[in-house]
């Protein structure tokens, strides 16, 4: 057995590993290439595992299907309000420490979202 759905924003070696551990009839969602290496797809694994590899480009999806995009965002916000999902927040910074927030992101000291708070 393996993973039914894999969300891959990294690419490179992570993509290669994902293809090896995906379940029969699984779905691999290609989100980005943070590793800096765009992986090459070995189509024999797609055949043997009966899986699908799907590119997910939010900007183009939002442009082509704005109604569905709005509905998806509303559904997500409803789940947040109902407590069904909770975004992982790694760090909080006041606006005055925006440069420190960027340094934390660039040095990969964060594991979730970074929030910058603006005072009214």
Regions found by a protein language model. Name each.
Residues 77, 84-91, 99-120:
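C-terminal capping/lid region of NAD(P)-dependent oxidoreductase domains
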Residues 39, 91-94:
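A structural signal for short, well-ordered beta-strand elements
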Residues 9-10, 93-97:
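Short beta->alpha linker loops
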Residues 13-85, 117-120:
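Glycine-rich phosphate-binding loop and adjacent beta-alpha segment
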Residues 16, 96-99:
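A broad detector of short, well-ordered amphipathic alpha-helices
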Residues 1:
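Glycine-rich phosphate-binding loop signature in dinucleotide/nucleotide-binding domains
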Residues 4-7:
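N-terminal Rossmann-like NAD(P) cofactor-binding module of classical short-chain dehydrogenase/reductase
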